[in-house]
């Protein structure tokens, strides 16, 4: 039988549970910015009105490299059945993306430094001024920040947690 050797008393280790609860209390007492970002009272560093113009968009292109889009891609893959929008993740230099250029996309360009070569190349190939573009980058002068200004696109400043 599969349940041989499994005893319910093994799941009732209150001492360890209380130890975990105490550790959690200590973490919550610290004013860690990442933990604070999960609270209902957290204030974003941007105006959420910026995001409203993307509500009507059906297709999104996320342009970035490595950690800049891996988390987003993981969340999308996990919730794919529930998400009603289409996402195309562009995280390398791929010739096949040129075929997708004709479709209408809203572009989310993500680069913490704003100087990642592959992101800049894909940005120059895939975006134009008539697209809906949203840049997520540090609040400093970088190539990506200057492109956002040139395209008159919205910029959300990347937080350094």
What are these regions (language model features)?
Residues 55-161:
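Glycine-rich phosphate-binding loops that contact phosphosugars or nucleotide phosphates
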Residues 48-49, 123:
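Short alpha-helical segments and helix-capping/turn motifs at coil-helix boundaries
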């Amino acid at each position: 039988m599969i349940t041989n050797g499994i005893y319910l008393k093994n799941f009732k280790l209150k001492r360890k549970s209380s130890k975990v609860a105490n550790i959690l209390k200590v973490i919550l007492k610290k004013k860690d910015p990442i933990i604070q970002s999960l609270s209902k009272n957290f204030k974003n560093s941007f105006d959420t009105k910026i995001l409203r113009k993307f509500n009507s968009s059906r297709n999104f292109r996320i342009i970035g490299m490595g950690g800049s889009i891996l988390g987003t891609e993981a969340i999308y893959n996990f919730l794919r059945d529930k998400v009603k929008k289409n996402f195309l993740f562009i995280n390398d230099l791929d010739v096949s993306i040129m075929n997708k250029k004709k479709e209408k996309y809203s572009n989310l360009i993500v680069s913490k430094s704003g100087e990642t070569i592959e992101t800049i190349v894909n940005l120059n190939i895939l975006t134009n001024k008539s697209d809906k573009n949203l840049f997520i980058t540090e609040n400093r002068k970088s190539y990506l920040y200057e492109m956002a200004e040139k395209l008159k696109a919205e910029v959300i400043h990347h937080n350094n947690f």
